[in-house]
Amino acid sequence: AFLSVNKKARVFAQRAAFGPLYGLDEGQPPRFVGLDIALASHPQVRLLDGEYAIDEHLYLFPWVSAEGAATPSNRSLMEEMDGEMVRDRLMHEQSLIIREGDKRFLVAGCAHNGIAAILDRFREIEGRSPDAVLSGFHLSGPGTSAAPPDEALSALAARLSAHHATYYTGHCTGQSAYERLSELLPGRMGHLSAGLSFSL
């Protein structure tokens, strides 16, 4: 739909985004959740195989390998490999670094590999922490707003506090997890919602 109304915008996607990706719903067969393969050859789509500098201000980096950092909510995400359903390796995910003057910002999606691991990769690339992060944290699974155990949220808050950033999050973070993280990181959490406008 987007490409049918915008004839100029470039779309950058990791090549793996066009793979056979599926979601699991309890008691149901795997449901295809990937992209239409026909879009891969669209003239406005640029397929990437790793990190990519769009220009001096915008830099994309793909998924990060973070053993143990991915959230339990990922268990419903699958991909097809050699005719078998396996856990999604999340190689289709990417994050965006925005460089504006002396400010640095991180924009991620649902951070399925763990926002803390993505922040660590940001620091490796930039040599510093971001000033602000806009991302889902993928702490609540499909169809539930239940938060992870408090010890898991406390451990995440400790990782986040080491980066001295302000965090704007919503969607897959879940309301109860957001409220608890706001208590653990006072003054450093902001809620993202559709139509929100703010200055960084």
Give names to the regions the model predicted.
Residues 54-60, 143, 178-179, 199-200:
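Short, solvent-exposed polar/charged micro-motifs at secondary-structure junctions
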